Amino acid sequence: MSRIGRLPIKIPDAVKVDVKDNLVIVEGIRGRLVQDIKDSINVKVENGSVIVDRVLNDKKAKAYHGLYRSLIFNMVKGVTEGFSKSLTINGIGYRVEQQGNSLFLSLGYSTQFEYVIPDGISVKLDGNTKISVEGIDKFKVGQVAAEIRSLKKPEPYKGKGIKYDNEVIRRKVGKSGVKK
């Protein structure tokens, strides 16, 4: 039995979970999420909790067991609390502006980058160097944050670029002058 997969998921009062065919539908205060489930996994709702079991006992079913339990847990957490990732922009002249549904990032190049924010994601700016990405879908929040970060990854010499708030950048020492 999977150590993660065997744990039941408690359903809060404000959340409604439905299992229809191979779909798990989670509805809550913040919104609605849907997850497709493989045939080798069985999901049932009983006594105020979600239980994930596997039908088959092969290698793939064992792998999917823990995966789907984690995905459903993240869905329940997302519709109640939501998820957020924070990014910081470091560098002289590096800044971000929000206009409608787009972010405009000045990252040391001659032109600005325009990043269109997808549906289901909200972005908040704190000043012009802090970005907070929020939403109910953990995958989407992480994907949007990673796409914004990939526009200018932090470099190891001065740390210029876009980094996650909790990210530690390994710094390198620059070239030292040759002594004669």
Swiss-Prot record:
Keywords: Ribonucleoprotein, Ribosomal protein, RNA-binding, rRNA-binding. This protein binds to the 23S rRNA, and is important in its secondary structure. It is located near the subunit interface in the base of the L7/L12 stalk, and near the tRNA binding site of the peptidyltransferase center. It holds the Pfam family Ribosomal_L6. The lineage of its organism: Bacteria, Pseudomonadati, Spirochaetota, Spirochaetia, Spirochaetales. The keyword RNA-binding applies. Belongs to the universal ribosomal protein uL6 family. The keyword Endoplasmic reticulum does not apply. Part of the 50S ribosomal subunit. GO terms for biological process: cytoplasmic translation. This is Large ribosomal subunit protein uL6. PROSITE patterns: RIBOSOMAL_L6_1. One of its GO terms (cellular component) is cytosolic large ribosomal subunit. SUPFAM superfamilies: Ribosomal protein L6 (SSF56053). GO terms for molecular function: rRNA binding; structural constituent of ribosome.
